[in-house]
Amino acid sequence: MRNTVIALSLGLGLGLCSLPSMAASLAEQFSLMEKGAESALDTRLFSHDGVDIKAWVDGAPVIIAVPIMNEQGKLEGESRYYFKGGKLFGVKEPAAQFAFDDGGKLTQWLDEKGQPAEFVSKMSMQQREVWLTKRAAELGKLFAQSPAEQKAAKGGVKLKGAELAHWLCNGKLMALAGGDKVTFEQAKLKTRADGIEGEVSLRQEKGWQDLSLKCEVQGPQVTRLTWQPLPGANKPL
């Protein structure tokens, strides 16, 4: 039975098979996808806009989980984006659920109990469809291979071990954070064959930003890259 559940879950996420639309509620389909992802898929964890965003991936993301923070920086909940065959399938928020068809059209807007949300106009549906689709595309790009990862995957990099991991992490940081150069002090950065951890400086458009980061690597892929700005304003270029 367990194998059957996993197979159905992955089918929903990857487009290998699908349940009839009336066979399971949207929440149940989300749950099946989550069980399958937890059992069989690789994960990625990257920082973006001040939060650490997790994805379960099979090449492309199947589920992306985004923390929701309040104005005081405290965790209030989580939004989850679900993808089926590489297309946005649904979104789950603390107080709402949304379903999309294969053409990218928002077809359901449900409340936290799984019932049709009240007082939702056609214009509201259209606006929410545009916003969620745009947000999903933005999040999906975070988990695309960086130029450094692409080059390493094709065998175009002669570095090995800790040097390769350091190079991959620097490339990923520049791709995600929008910088063009990374510097570091040897005493403040630990480098290993499976990643780096410590302090670096990233050159961005507004100047140099000191960061405390942790980066993990598996083969030519960066599987985790999380960071926090260190105290102090950007240093001039």
Residue ranges and their predicted role:
Residues 41-45, 49-55, 63-69, 78-79, ...:
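Periodic aromatic/glycine/histidine/acidic cluster detector
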Residues 70-73, 77, 129-237:
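Mitochondrial intermembrane space
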